Amino acid sequence: MSADSIRILTVCTGNICRSPAAERLLAAGLGDAAQVTSAGTGALSGYPMDAAMVPLVEAAGASTDGFAARQLTPAMVKSADLILALTTAHRSQAVRLAPVAVRRSFTLLELARIVGSPAFPALTTESVSDRLREMVQQAAPRRMLGADGVVDDDVPDPFRRGPEVFMSSFVMIRDAVDVIVDAVH
């Protein structure tokens, strides 16, 4: 991680399925440009990533080593340059902990939809970390970009559900991460 790395925080409920998958995929895709962590609004603190999510994340080329769930705190939200929640409810909970973070808080799917829109401006800064910062600044006033009609920006919680739900949630996360990573590379 470089000195100018952007701090990204991913948030879900238990911090064992969705947010750790997003964390590890973003970390793999962004490398030293970002310090990516995750936390849960009702975390199963200390637990590893759910066993059903591990092979999906690893097959995508990201490491699951050393992961332990953490409870979301106001300090985490305040210190993050970008908060990526897995549902709109998680985003609301994070912003309630630190209202100052509202303009840098998105759902993962929302940010991918915004930056993936043809109307989103090209990012022009030099480094990947600077392009990530520029992306956050450009995305905040464009929250409805690409939202044609009713938009569901939530990734379903696969916890204690079947492998099909894990795969569906994982694919949504992976595809959104790919859009975000591609936008800054």
Task: Please state what every model-predicted region is.
Residues 87-88, 109:
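Short secondary-structure boundary segments
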Residues 95-185:
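Phosphate-binding/catalytic loops
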